[in-house]
């Protein structure tokens, strides 16, 4: 199975997001991208939507429930939210939804900043491997991979997807 081209998914995602927000009466949501791929996808969506609002960024490294097992990522970046969270409608963007743990960590961090009116979840890919009850409101494509396979977004320009096969320890 070949991987989709993100540039082909983004226009439909923008259209689906526009419809989703209109259905809920949300006119000026604030966008938040999760480092690093979620930021790239959020930037591309903002361009597709013609939205000039500032983009918030989250690095959820300290909020992950597995960092004591895996250690911190060597490039922890500060989160930057150039707007108030309280009462805002947020669009949270990630590149690949797998277990749901990154999204859980992002929600925990967002709520440390304030109480949003709503959070709409947008993911480029959904790998159908969730361990938590988290589901995207807008998704580019759903894929099923083998247990030893992963997908990574590379970018920022052009955006592309790479498949990785995990090596098994003997």
UniProtKB/Swiss-Prot annotation:
Residues noted as binding substrate in the record, renumbered to the chain: 36-37, 77, 94-102, 151
Single GO molecular function: uracil phosphoribosyltransferase activity
Motif (PRPP-binding): 90-102
Catalytically driven reaction(s): UMP + diphosphate = 5-phospho-alpha-D-ribose 1-diphosphate + uracil
Top-level lineage group: Bacteria
Record-level GO BP terms: regulation of DNA-templated transcription
Gene3D superfamilies per the UniProt record, alphabetical: 3.40.50.2020
Keywords on record: Glycosyltransferase, Transcription, Transcription regulation, Transferase
Stored SUPFAM superfamilies: PRTase-like
EC numbers, comma separated: 2.4.2.9
Keyword match Hydrolase: no
Keyword Transcription regulation attached: yes
Family under the similarity heading: Belongs to the purine/pyrimidine phosphoribosyltransferase family. PyrR subfamily.
NCBIfam families membership: PRK05205.1-1
HAMAP family to which the protein is assigned, alphabetical: PyrR
Protein name: Bifunctional protein PyrR
Lineage: Bacteria, Pseudomonadati, Pseudomonadota, Gammaproteobacteria, Pseudomonadales
Gene (UniProt): pyrR
């Amino acid at each position: 199975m070949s991987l989709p081209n993100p540039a082909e998914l983004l226009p439909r995602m923008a259209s689906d997001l526009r419809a989703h927000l209109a259905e809920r009466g949300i006119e000026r949501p604030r966008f938040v991208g999760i480092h690093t791929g979620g930021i790239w996808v959020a930037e591309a969506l903002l361009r597709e939507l013609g939205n000039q609002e500032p983009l918030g960024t989250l690095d959820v490294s300290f909020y992950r429930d597995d960092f004591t097992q895996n250690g911190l990522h060597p490039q922890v970046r500060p989160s930057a939210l150039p707007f108030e969270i309280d009462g805002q409608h947020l669009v949270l963007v990630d590149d690949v939804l797998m277990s749901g743990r990154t999204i859980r960590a992002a929600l925990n961090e967002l709520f440390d900043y304030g109480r949003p009116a709503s959070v709409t979840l947008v993911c480029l890919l959904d790998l159908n491997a969730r361990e938590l009850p988290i589901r995207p409101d807008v998704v580019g494509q759903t894929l099923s991979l083998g247990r030893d396979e992963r997908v990574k977004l590379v970018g920022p320009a052009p955006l592309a997807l790479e498949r990785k096969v995990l090596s098994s320890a003997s």
